[in-house]
């Protein structure tokens, strides 16, 4: 784990500095040791951030990404594993044992905050999740370029023809066994931190690619950053509600599948976290 490695290196560096300077022979080590530890740790964090900046600068967003980049994915995963404990985020994961042990799938989840993809990447490290996201995400600092290298699929929901191209691209990614696809079918972060109606078009991906649908729900991600700024711990809950086998999708329409997924999510979240139908 990257955080553990950084801590170990910082301890060794601090001890080495104290031993090399001879301060262990005086009471000076009482301040030299913690200062050396903190300084080394901060330098490691800054160095890792600079590495990510350099990697981001090297990405050409105009060049199509033909395959998943293990290097960029590994760096992103390590960044997530580093940030979660630093921000004192407790992630409670349940139901993950239901996830397909092999093969590709379409993962769908409700959307509360920009950090949601990080929570899903952390929970499914071996699934090579490629996210469908709105075009604006491509311009987000660091995030857009790293998602691009991990086969991210930007979608233009305002243009049906462009949206169809993204759906067809996702189907190819699944057919060619390049990655599993993850999407937030509400179509973005909506108001009230509750579940909104789903956009059914994305379910054509599972129907055409003949892959199972992994249905998840998230709670609490919208509170993480505000609590972190107050130096308070936070809790995020990720629940894998269920898996719809590919065989059960045969003969169904995207609307039918979307309604089934919506009911699964709504039942799991409970009425207090679901927008009433009368308010749609």
Question: Residue locations for each model-derived region?
Answer:
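Thr-Gly-centered strand-to-loop micro-motif
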Residues: 94, 132-134, 156-157, 185, ...
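A short acidic, often aromatic-flanked loop/helix-cap motif at beta-alpha or helix-coil junctions
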Residues: 99-101, 139, 160-163, 244-250
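Catalytic core of membrane glycerolipid acyltransferases/transacylases, capturing the structured
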Residues: 55-77, 85, 101-160
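A generic local structural motif
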Residues: 78-79, 90-95, 117-118, 167-169, ...
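Non-catalytic C-terminal accessory region of glycerolipid acyltransferases
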Residues: 6, 164-280
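Membrane-anchoring hydrophobic helices of lipid-metabolizing enzymes
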Residues: 1-104
């Amino acid at each position: 784990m990257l955080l553990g490695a950084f801590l170990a290196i910082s301890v060794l560096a601090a001890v080495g500095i104290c031993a090399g300077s001879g301060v262990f022979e005086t009471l000076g080590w009482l301040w030299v040791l913690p200062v050396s530890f903190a300084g080394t740790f901060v330098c490691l964090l800054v160095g890792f951030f600079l590495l990510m900046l350099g990697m981001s600068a090297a990405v050409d967003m105009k060049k199509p990404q033909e395959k998943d980049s293990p290097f960029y994915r590994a760096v992103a995963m390590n960044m997530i594993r580093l940030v979660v404990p630093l921000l004192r985020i407790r992630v409670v994961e349940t139901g993950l044992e239901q996830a397909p042990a092999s093969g590709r799938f379409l993962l769908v989840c409700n959307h509360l905050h920009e950090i949601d993809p990080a929570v899903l990447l952390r929970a499914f490290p071996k699934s090579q999740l490629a996210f469908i996201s709105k075009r604006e995400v491509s311009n987000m600092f660091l995030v857009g370029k790293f998602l691009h290298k991990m086969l991210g699929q930007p979608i233009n929901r305002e243009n049906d023809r462009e949206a169809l191209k993204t759906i067809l691209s996702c189907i190819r990614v699944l057919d060619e066994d390049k990655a599993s696809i993850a999407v937030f079918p509400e179509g973005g972060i909506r108001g009230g931190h509750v579940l909104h109606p789903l956009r059914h078009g994305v379910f054509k991906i599972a129907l055409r690619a003949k892959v199972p649908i992994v249905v998840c729900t998230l709670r609490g991600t919208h509170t993480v950053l505000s609590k972190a700024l107050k130096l308070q711990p936070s809790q995020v809950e990720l629940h894998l509600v269920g898996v719809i086998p590919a065989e059960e999708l045969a003969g169904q329409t995207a609307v039918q599948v979307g309604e089934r997924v919506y009911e699964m999510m709504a039942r799991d979240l409970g009425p207090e976290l679901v927008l009433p139908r009368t308010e749609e």
